[in-house]
């Protein structure tokens, strides 16, 4: 395994971990706790596969799709739902009796760590196993890994609200899964549809929609961080 592809796969997650740590600099979490949460996030990969493979075997998840509906269905069923469900389960296991989870921002920080643990390993698998690793590494550094960062912010934002606003715990607990699943599903749907045979003009529109969506995804995540810091 070449060192350069491996390094290029690692860097995006490390940079974003440093960014969320910096945003929480006024009341930072113990570094050991952050490393534990990130390491736990790596386990979301095998957990996701444990969900996906049986569903593929019984035919619930499509191995191939040739229609727009099939692309959207696959985006949610094979990626968005199992991945975000796995991350939320691991986040819950990590925080359910964690005394360091005592501020709203903490939920975002730990959820981002779990999400980037997942994204880091996923990125390594995509980059180092691809001959055209450089272009894959660049595109995923710009879109895929920051996307997982944003899903983590969404999950942690509502997870914290569920803890610190107990009167609305059920609603916020549901949103901690639903919101990142929808965001992740839309992101993947736009990409998956572009892999189906569609007219060039429609592909151009979808590409524009994808770029606009990514912009607003990051904007929403930034605002959510500010709300919980404030």
Briefly describe each language-model feature range.
Residues 1-230:
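Hydrophobic alpha-helical segments at protein termini of multi-pass membrane proteins
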């Amino acid at each position: 395994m070449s060192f350069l592809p491996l390094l290029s796969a690692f860097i995006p997650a490390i940079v974003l971990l440093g960014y969320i740590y910096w945003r929480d600099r006024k009341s930072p979490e113990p570094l050991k706790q952050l490393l534990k949460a990130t390491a736990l996030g790596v386990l979301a990969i095998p957990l996701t596969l444990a969900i996906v493979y049986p569903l593929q075997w019984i035919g619930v998840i499509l191995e191939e799709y040739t229609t727009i509906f099939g692309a959207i269905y696959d985006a949610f069923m094979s990626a968005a739902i199992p991945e975000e469900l796995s991350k939320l389960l691991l986040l819950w296991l990590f925080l359910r009796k964690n005394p360091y989870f005592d501020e709203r921002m903490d939920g975002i920080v730990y959820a981002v760590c779990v999400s980037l643990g997942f994204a880091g390993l996923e990125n390594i698998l995509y980059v180092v196993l691809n001959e055209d690793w450089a272009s894959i590494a660049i595109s995923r550094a710009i879109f895929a890994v920051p996307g997982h960062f944003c899903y983590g912010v969404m999950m942690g934002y509502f997870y914290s609200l569920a803890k610190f606003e107990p009167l609305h715990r059920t609603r916020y607990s549901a949103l901690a899964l639903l919101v990142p699943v929808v965001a992740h599903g839309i992101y993947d749907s736009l990409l998956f549809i572009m892999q189906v045979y569609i007219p060039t003009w429609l592909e151009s529109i979808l590409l524009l929609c994808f770029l606009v969506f990514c912009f607003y995804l990051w904007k929403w995540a930034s605002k959510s961080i500010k709300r919980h810091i404030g």
